[in-house]
Amino acid sequence: MTAATLVTLALSLSLAQHDAAPAPAAAPVEQHGAPAPEAAAPDAHAAPAGEHGAAVEAHAAAAGEHGDAAGHEGGHDESLGAVMMHHVTDGYVIEHPGFCHGALAWNCEWDLRETFGDALRFGALDMTPTKHVMMMWFASALLLVVVLAAVRKKSLVPRGLYNFIEVLVAFVRNEIAVKNIGERDADRFVPYLVTAFFFILFLNLFGLIPFSATATANLSVTVALALFTFLITQYAAIRAMGVGGYLAHLTGGVPKSLAPLWIIMIPVEFLGLFTKPFALTVRLFANMVAGHFVILALLGLIFALGTPWVAFGSVPMALGIFLLELFVAFVQAYIFTMLSSLFIGAGLVHHGDDHGHAEEHGHAGPGMGSEHGSHVAGASPGHG
């Protein structure tokens, strides 16, 4: 998988450089109105303009299909930048190897708009799935298959895939949920935390497969994931404290005798409610985008410097970053799940009753004494 990914990225950069070369030749045809023999070349090149791929760079009318395709006319550097953006941005075209244009090719394209047509268009609302949405569907289906396959092989002595899944689930429950939420309340939120962990993990790993895409490098996806945590956190807080206690919590623990300070504390505490999902959103998005940009930049050095000798240094470095991305895929899934449990646990604790809450958990289960109370207090709303 590693070698295939690097070869795929290198071929993409090479194709972009090759397609960008004839672009300046089309300018004199439009500006000076060259004779018919000279104009025949661009017409022949633009014939397959209805298709995506090389015709996008040659025919300006189809530039809208590929975002920054017009940037190829600007020169060599812009073409490399366009390829880098193409690998991390969303779209309606999925590239894949297969049989297309009458021959086997590695750069065939699946246009989702042609597949779904007008079936998911309702007036101005276009519900046609994009590339990243398809990746989420694929990841969800694969996750369901893996979990069901693991459960079917359940035995008294866990082994193989079932053992691996069980270890991860137990880790999320015991080391993340129980430690940050408390043993008394953890089991209510374990299903969400386990689902979030595996879903993000599969999305991160999908982005490392050749011809796939990283959905977690889409800001809309990370916002949606963080929004789920935000809503669950507010639900847990209102259920634990009631509406009155929840609203009183926005005063930041300032007593009524200092009520004028509420003018300052309430806006601060209110903004604090949204800094937590914002941190979840940006952290996951930035980490997943950064790794892919580094790999593409290292491979792009081969074409930017115009010499194959650079590959002896850039390819091993890109391979190292790729292996690091495998580790990052697990780390980011863990961090998102851990922070989500931390925020949920903080929502269950009233700002002024941290010690009492800790004492309750001290009797609820082992290892849940004042340490849990101080841990949650440090993450209470308004201090994140």
From Swiss-Prot:
Quaternary structure and interacting proteins, as annotated: F-type ATPases have 2 components, CF(1) - the catalytic core - and CF(0) - the membrane proton channel. CF(1) has five subunits: alpha(3), beta(3), gamma(1), delta(1), epsilon(1). CF(0) has three main subunits: a(1), b(2) and c(9-12). The alpha and beta chains form an alternating ring which encloses part of the gamma chain. CF(1) is attached to CF(0) by a central stalk formed by the gamma and epsilon chains, while a peripheral stalk is formed by the delta and b chains.
Entry similarity comment: Belongs to the ATPase A chain family.
Any Pfam family the entry gives: ATP-synt_A
Gene: atpB
Record membrane topology: Multi-pass membrane protein
A GO MF label: proton-transporting ATP synthase activity, rotational mechanism
UniProt keyword annotations, A-Z: ATP synthesis, Cell inner membrane, Cell membrane, CF(0), Hydrogen ion transport, Ion transport, Membrane, Transmembrane, Transmembrane helix, Transport
GO cellular component, one term: plasma membrane
Function according to Swiss-Prot or TrEMBL: Key component of the proton channel; it plays a direct role in the translocation of protons across the membrane.
CDD domains linked: ATP-synt_Fo_a_6 (cd00310)
PROSITE patterns: ATPASE_A (PS00449)
Protein name: ATP synthase subunit a
Domain of life where this protein originates: Bacteria
HAMAP family attached to this UniProt entry: ATP_synth_a_bact
Residues that span the membrane, as ranges: 131-151, 189-209, 218-238, 258-278, 293-313, 319-339
Region described as Disordered: spans on this chain: 22-60, 355-384
Compartments it resides in: Cell inner membrane
InterPro entries reported in the protein's UniProt record: ATP_synth_F0_asu, ATP_synth_F0_asu_AS, ATP_synth_F0_asu_bact/mt, F0_ATP_A_sf
Gene3D superfamilies: ATP synthase, F0 complex, subunit A (1.20.120.220)
